[in-house]
Amino acid sequence: MIKVPRFICMIALTSGILASGLSQSVSAHTEKSEPSSTYHFHSDPLLYLAPPPTSGSPLQAHDDQTFNSTRQLKGSTRWALATQDADLHLASVLKDYACAAGMNLDIAQLPHLANLIKRALRTEYDDIGRAKNNWNRKRPFVDTDQPICTEKDREGLGKQGSYPSGHTTIGWSVALILAELIPDHAANILQRGQIFGTSRIVCGAHWFSDVQAGYIMASGEIAALHGDADFRRDMELARKELEKARTSAHTPDDLLCKIEQSAR
């Protein structure tokens, strides 16, 4: 179990890409952006995210300890879940939330939901990239021989900034959207969003503090998007679509749900 300082947990809870590259994950996995494919409201993470921990600080010591201790999870069921969570294709991300939502989330059957999430993530793209480039933090596995759950992406990830975690920003953004759309499953959805972020720590792709910043950034982005009339309209369309789909949706795979529950 990953030990989390209580005050950091509270920040993440109250505040609330990148297996082969941020640009590839967002643009390729959500199709090419067009002027009308994003929303107009977004937040500036450089104004509200604290800088990453400095070398020799207690927070960096906690980051180091967490990274080293979680390397022991290689080969475990939790490691496999972290590998699964690294896939940012929209169909895969929504599948990750199926158990928590109590229904399969098939993008082919939920076009309004798919459009909503694609536009939201495209809107976040520049903010995530700007924050990463601003701090250009080295990832925890760089200059080590420690394993990560997506070894094929090791070289590419090592060239990208670690802070904040783009995967976590995306995962928590999706969790916030789904929790609002399916309020009777909100707690489970948010819990799955927290697990999605923790997967980046388990994977070894991010420091603990990168993930905490990702939760905060996602919360800022989604809060700002609510100021966009198009976003609110798309939310309502997705809400009605989900309400209708729930009457005939298939239930998620029971084995997968049990694996996710074991990660809690």
UniProtKB/Swiss-Prot annotation:
The keyword Nucleus does not apply. Its EC number is 3.1.3.2. Its cofactor is Mg(2+); Zn(2+). GO terms for molecular function: acid phosphatase activity. Keywords: Hydrolase, Magnesium, Periplasm, Signal. It is an enzyme of class 3 (hydrolase). It is found in: Periplasm. Most active with magnesium. PROSITE patterns: ACID_PHOSPH_CL_A (PS01157). Residues 1-28 form the signal peptide. GO terms for cellular component: outer membrane-bounded periplasmic space. It catalyses: a phosphate monoester + H2O = an alcohol + phosphate. The keyword Hydrolase applies. It comes from the Bacteria. Belongs to the class A bacterial acid phosphatase family. This is Acid phosphatase. It comes from Zymomonas mobilis subsp. mobilis (strain ATCC 31821 / ZM4 / CP4). The lineage of its organism: Bacteria, Pseudomonadati, Pseudomonadota, Alphaproteobacteria, Sphingomonadales.
